[in-house]
Amino acid sequence: GKMYVMIQKRQKTVEKGRPVEKWDDYLKCWCEVKSLYGKELYTALEAKLENVMNFETRYCKALEALNTKEYRVVWGERIFKLINADYGKYDRRKVVLKGQEVV
């Protein structure tokens, strides 16, 4: 079903001489949360990727900045590290964010 998710951006700072990592809210967006199925599911399992979900959302300019290492998706109490952002097949109408749950 459709629901809000929060995309967060990793911020790295140095405090008292030590590197500190924190996550700041970047973009709240309305997504359709979809489980993997069929060929996509088997490919993920072969690559040892478990607890992977697709977050399908409407395209917006802010989503173009997503490089996968610096962003994550927060859905309720669950956190997903971003492993792919697919802008391609929907001709800039939709973006599919693929996230793996951090457990």
Language model regions located:
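Active-site-proximal polar cores
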Residues: G1-V20
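Short, conserved turn/kink motifs that form compact alpha/beta structural patches or helix kinks used as
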Residues: P19-V103
